[in-house]
Amino acid sequence: ASYKIHLVNKDQGIDETIECPDDQYILDAAEEQGLDLPYSCRAGACSTCAGKLLEGEVDQSDQSFLDDDQVKAGFVLTCVAYPTSNATILTHQEESLY
């Protein structure tokens, strides 16, 4: 399956909808489609790529950085997040984690 992922951040001038297969990380799909999103480790072990899920669902079981409260609040590490539905993600949210 493939899902539509709406990536948005007014401050960064981002308002794009990408196609993302359910077996591809959202960060990788965004890069393939020409979007320049922040990242560092690409392994789910830091917060550089963090976004916030505004709607929809992802599988980010590969991540090891976010705590349960942050996950419940909707934070998502785009470098290890597979989409499980159409979703809207607010990008560049590392600073909001703290």
Curated annotation (Swiss-Prot):
Binds 1 [2Fe-2S] cluster. [2Fe-2S] cluster binds at C41, C46, C49, C79. Keywords: 2Fe-2S, Chloroplast, Electron transport, Iron, Iron-sulfur, Metal-binding, Plastid, Transport. Pfam families: Fer2. It comes from the Eukaryota. GO terms for molecular function: 2 iron, 2 sulfur cluster binding; electron transfer activity; metal ion binding. One of its GO terms (biological process) is electron transport chain. Its cofactor is [2Fe-2S] cluster. It is found in: Plastid, Chloroplast. Residues 3-95 form the 2Fe-2S ferredoxin-type domain. InterPro entries: 2Fe-2S_ferredoxin-like_sf (IPR036010), 2Fe-2S_ferredoxin-type (IPR001041), 2Fe2S_fd_BS (IPR006058), Beta-grasp_dom_sf (IPR012675), Fd_pln (IPR010241). Belongs to the 2Fe2S plant-type ferredoxin family. Ferredoxins are iron-sulfur proteins that transfer electrons in a wide variety of metabolic reactions. This is Ferredoxin. It comes from Cyanidium caldarium.
